[in-house]
């Protein structure tokens, strides 16, 4: 599984950071999935290997502008490029009204259908051939969700000795069983894939959080999770000065939660625009990492725009470079 940060700034962009967007794929950029779509996301995508033509679904965490203002431009650009495949948009109900209003009032149209799915439905679950997705309600000024991505249809290994012992010679049936399909033989026997195959590894699981001032809400979902991507808008001293109203997390809060939950990998993002990246800048973005490292002993990453990370099948997380 790979994910690329298209924007890591909170609220407003900076010279080096766009507002929120994240591209996720399983084994390559076809298909891929987008989590949030702040202003300028489609322009950020032009600097990556992802194409709007292969976008399978969008997952919107909440309705604040730094997470949705890029939607109309991206959707209409896909139409101008000739997209015809339907696109799933998993989002709060207001997002549909927002998109409809912009399309109607800008004399725009789409060449493909949008399938809106209410992210706030109590029984929410989405899946395709590659991923199953649930979500968790967070604590923010408006309803907000974290999305839990778990891979599906893991590769199976044939139990060849058992097949041979049961008189089933190598042939097309073996391939079907390995694909998870049950097979009906000419002699009337039904071969069940689960009886002749096994899955040798555990599914990879990633959580992508929206805005949230209470990381503990993710405690249950984090069981068995290999990567948590969570906002760290402030250092704790800034959070104390700002007060509770914005309902964001500090690096300290998230790090303490990740340590208590024994998360192996933590990636922080959504940094206040006050934090600078240039050498000598103050306050500097490295202060967020320094604060988190005081409380978290797992593998910590501070996301930057266009950083790409790969979660391997052995659950090791590392940065990759596709250039």
UniProtKB/Swiss-Prot annotation:
Binding site for Zn(2+) 1: 62, 64, 140, 211
Pfam families: Lactamase_B
Reactions performed catalytically: Endonucleolytic cleavage of RNA, removing extra 3' nucleotides from tRNA precursor, generating 3' termini of tRNAs. A 3'-hydroxy group is left at the tRNA terminus and a 5'-phosphoryl group is left at the trailer molecule
Keyword line: Endonuclease, Hydrolase, Metal-binding, Nuclease, tRNA processing, Zinc
Cofactor binding description: Binds 2 Zn(2+) ions.
Residues annotated as catalytic: 66 (proton acceptor)
Catalytic activity, EC: 3.1.26.11
Residues at which Zn(2+) 2 binds: 66-67, 211, 270
Keyword DNA-binding applies: no
Transit peptide listed as a keyword: no
Cofactor(s) listed in the protein's UniProt record: Zn(2+)
Listed SUPFAM superfamilies: Metallo-hydrolase/oxidoreductase
MF annotations from Gene Ontology: 3'-tRNA processing endoribonuclease activity; zinc ion binding
Family: Belongs to the RNase Z family.
Assembly information from the UniProt record: Homodimer.
Function as written in the Swiss-Prot or TrEMBL entry: Zinc phosphodiesterase, which displays some tRNA 3'-processing endonuclease activity. Probably involved in tRNA maturation, by removing a 3'-trailer from precursor tRNA.
HAMAP family associated with the record: RNase_Z_BN (MF_01818)
Annotated protein name in UniProt: Ribonuclease Z
Organism per entry: Marinobacter nauticus (strain ATCC 700491 / DSM 11845 / VT8)
Record lineage: Bacteria, Pseudomonadati, Pseudomonadota, Gammaproteobacteria, Pseudomonadales
Gene (UniProt): rnz
